[in-house]
Swiss-Prot record:
It is found in: Cell membrane. It holds the Pfam family Na_Ca_ex. Highly expressed in the eye. The uncleaved signal sequence is required for efficient membrane targeting and proper membrane integration and topology. This is Sodium/potassium/calcium exchanger 1. The modification Phosphothreonine is found at residue 690. It comes from Rattus norvegicus (Rat). The keyword Coiled coil does not apply. Calcium, potassium:sodium antiporter that transports 1 Ca(2+) and 1 K(+) in exchange for 4 Na(+). Critical component of the visual transduction cascade, controlling the calcium concentration of outer segments during light and darkness. Light causes a rapid lowering of cytosolic free calcium in the outer segment of both retinal rod and cone photoreceptors and the light-induced lowering of calcium is caused by extrusion via this protein which plays a key role in the process of light adaptation. It comes from the Eukaryota. GO terms for cellular component: cell surface; plasma membrane.
Amino acid sequence: MGKLIRMGTQERRLLRPKRLHWSRLLFFLGMLIIGSTYQHLRRPQNPPSMWTKVSSQQPIKLAIRDLPNDEITVTDKDPPEASSEVEGEMLAPQDTVIIGEAAPSIAMEDTPNPPITTKITPTSLKNNYSPTTAGTRRQKENIPPTPSRAPSHFISTSGRQRVKSYTPKPRGGRKSSSPTHTREEGRMHTPSPAGAPRTISPTSTEKDSETTATYRMLEPRSERTAGKTSLKRMVPNTRTFLTREVETDLVTSPSLVGKNTLGSPRRGERNSSTTPLRAVLQPTPATSEEQVTASIRMGSTPATTEGSTAAQRIGNPLSGTSTPAVRIASVTDREKRPSTAHGTLVTPQVKAVLTTQVHRCVVVKPAPAVPMTPSPSMTAILFPEAPTSGPSALPPGWPNLHPKAEYPPDLFSVEDRRQGWVVLHIFGMTYVFVALAIVCDEYFVPALGVITDKLQISEDVAGATFMAAGGSAPELFTSLIGVFISHSNVGIGTIVGSAVFNILFVIGTCALFSREILNLTWWPLFRDVSFYILDLSMLIVFFLDSLIAWWESLLLLLAYALYVFTMKWNKQIERWVKEQLSRRPVAKVMALGDLSKPSDGAIEENEQQDNKKLKLPSVLTRGSSSASLHNSIIRSTIYHLMLHSLDPLGEARPSKDKQESLNQEARVLPQTKAESSSDEEEPAELPAVTVTPAPAPEDKGDQEEDPGCQEDVDEAEHRGDMTGEEGERETEAEGKKDEEGETEAERKEDGQEEETETKGKEKQEGETESEGKDEQEGETEAEGKEADHEGETEAEGKEVEHEGETEAEGTEDEQEGETEAEGKEVEQEGETEAEGKEVEHEVETEAERKETNHEGETEAEGKEADHEGETEAEGNVEHQGETEAEGKVEHEGETEAGEKDEHEGQSETQADDTEVKDGEGEAEANAEDQCETAQGEKGADGGGGSDGGDSEEEEDEEDEEEEEEEEEEEEEEESEEPLSLEWPESRQKQAIYLFLLPIVFPLWLTIPDVRRQEARKFFVITFLGSIIWIAMFSYLMVWWAHQVGETIGISEEIMGLTILAAGTSIPDLITSVIVARKGLGDMAVSSSVGSNIFDITVGLPVPWLLFSLINALQPIPVSSNGLFCAIVLLFLMLLFVIFSIASCKWRMNKILGFTMFLLYFVFLVISVMLEDRIISCPVSV
């Protein structure tokens, strides 16, 4: 981009547009040349025939089954060709057998390589195929590889070869030439439809290669051998083509199954129930022999004699199936199955006892796509008993419409990959995970942030929409690829797996790795989980029929719109809900409030810490919208984490002691608030907070107890986000407002009131900021700090509070201070009175020690960390924390005043809490008194100008604050600094830099970085470019995952549930853990659930709806062996998490985290077993 030159405290950028312009142009040209060359080189290697042939062959249908058994009745004249595919010999026509031997010569005429021809008694299969189709039926399918091939497949080894590569018409001629043919013709002709099959309107399917069968009644076994040989030859040939086709067609069209069965009809039967494709591929010549020799006893007496011989051969009860026995997957399945379940069907179909040895059915239908459409109906007809496969049959059927996923050919064959080259695919898949995270964090999310600014969308709505889309983009594109390219359920598997990963693994990991027990706010969790349960329930209902209609997709999208609308009115809804809850009897509310209160002894400390921690996250995340973790300011990007922080978790930990861990809470809180309230950030980030914390679930006790104070404050806080000063001033500082205004005026006019001014001003700043920021930031800082200081410095905190009060207030405040501080205040007030202003500075120094460490850091971080990322913020925080702590005591004077305000708020809340515990009536009265005293104290602080001896220092503090603000703004700019390609210093970071360069450099060349002011106007290009890159990376991820699964033998659904789900969620996992270690459990939990809502209500229905619109509103099949059960499991896991957290009093301890961690792996094991049919889903549809 240019060089960065440090000038003073500012950075100026030297841009070289010309060089940049040419470098980008050359890069594009190079990419075009490389891409075109690659395509040119790859074209010759890709045989289009594979896919096209398969598709053309798939249409092949079994015509024979349609023929009525009557038609199939075999007379000696009847040639097996009636079942166009196979000539079957009837046992009765043993004479024919002799003819059959002579027939080979005839067959020879037709086909130089005659396979043994057997009469197809089942030629007229009773299967419901149309008679014409019956004639063509399975033999055609058997030929799938090439119609011409079928004749070649026929093996002359069987001495009686009637290789009838019949075109439907030639077949008739051949039949006439051989006596066996005559018989078949007689049979076929007997039923006029049978004759039709010979002609085989579907004959085209049969024509290329007809089943040649020797009907040896006397020599069934020898025929078997011949059949075996031919079938074996046939099988290898067909396997190549049939493997994919058969599987796909199995569900869709039995004909494909037939092809597979040719290899092994028995396996074909098994496979047809499960996966016909494999069965077809699996067929062994031995099985084919058995299938080939099929004795069908229809009912003709002569057949009975030969029935025994036929029985020896294979005894395929399916008359129709026996004819095409080898090739027709459906038929073959039935043939073998007939012995089990389908046998009955077969037996009725064959009226005449025929021994049909199908040495090979090489009839390939160059069938039009027509069979594909009818295939579902055909399947139903062919497999009336097959429905045992259940919904799984349907889903395979659809993918079968696209037998092969539309991926480019791999440089390595499956054998090569199994020898170890699959490691490259695994590495590529992992690398793409990192690439997706970088694109989303560095370009897509910032572009979304600019869009929300341009559209002036509120942060809650933006978080629920744009920011959630930024974090879930990989899952959305994986779903699109699964529907339109891979034709599998990989997208559903990825989203369901990602949802479970987010709920169990991410939250469990946060609980395990956080340095303290995570306290959660009930409202955001309750809100998001309620929507999530609603959406999951809808999804389960829609999955019941294994089809998703267009209106079902639309309903899911509308559910998302409802969620966005709720986020828009989140504050009002939350306030209304809490008001409803606050109207309950006090005992109930206190029960809620007491959830986090351990015992009376530690109540003040712990309750306030808990309440504040509980409240802060919700304020911090502005209603805990799902955007919280995807916010570009809070979120440390993967690139920054890898280059600037090799130990992000370690850096998150300033020290091991709890107070400092609480500090970090306080840090992040202001960070996020600074983001939301950047407009309201005034002179400095004063932690001063005069607002008593809004009632979190635990605060409700307080809320009720001082309705006059806290409810107003609650409203004030909600309004504070929007109105800034008004909210607090209305409730607590109305008097203070006037006096503060006066004190500011006085401060300019009078030198005496300068200290009051600081206090007044701090309270103004403290309040204005603390009201604008405060309620968004100051509160969080103050509360975070309160929480920080409450642990160690409650006494000091109260000293600070009350010293601040008493100093500013004079004797008035002593009394009020006594009322509030009760015991401690009086002592500390005595000190403060005696010490006067010195105490302030002592307090300042105390505050400085703790606050500068905390506040200095928090302020530094407040703006820095927001933008720089948590890790950088922490790095810089040290410097600024130190510099501010050392050099800016005055600033801490303000922070102290801020602290005093904070601590006034604390003392109020603490007093409230203690009073609450003491008695409800007292609590209410005291709360009101405290509200009044707080206002009075603040007024006294603002108006008691006698304390103003430190005016100069305070002015200096203000100047320093302004300077600090400028520095912080600069730091913010730095933290928002665009992607930098500067060479790092350490060897380790240099290695990481080189590792990431192949990802970062193309992105840097092709996408404008909207974090640069000059590129901000190109946000649309950045948005679209990011989407293109995310789509490309997602495609590579799914493709390589498919290759890995194919090599190892894992389906795409399982890959999606496990590896892809974890890979796309790892960036969120890293960020969630970092945030949780800072004490913000709410953000981690709410963001995890919120992103899941986006996945289920947008990631899934959008591809489905597009598919339906493109395909004339047809429903899309979605069922999978275990996917439905996985969704039900996800629902149960969600309920478990919620009940567990609620039973633990909204705290997440390490035992709960470890349990969730284990449950995730249990879910994975169960899901994989369901997909592989190792266990069956008890909740099957």
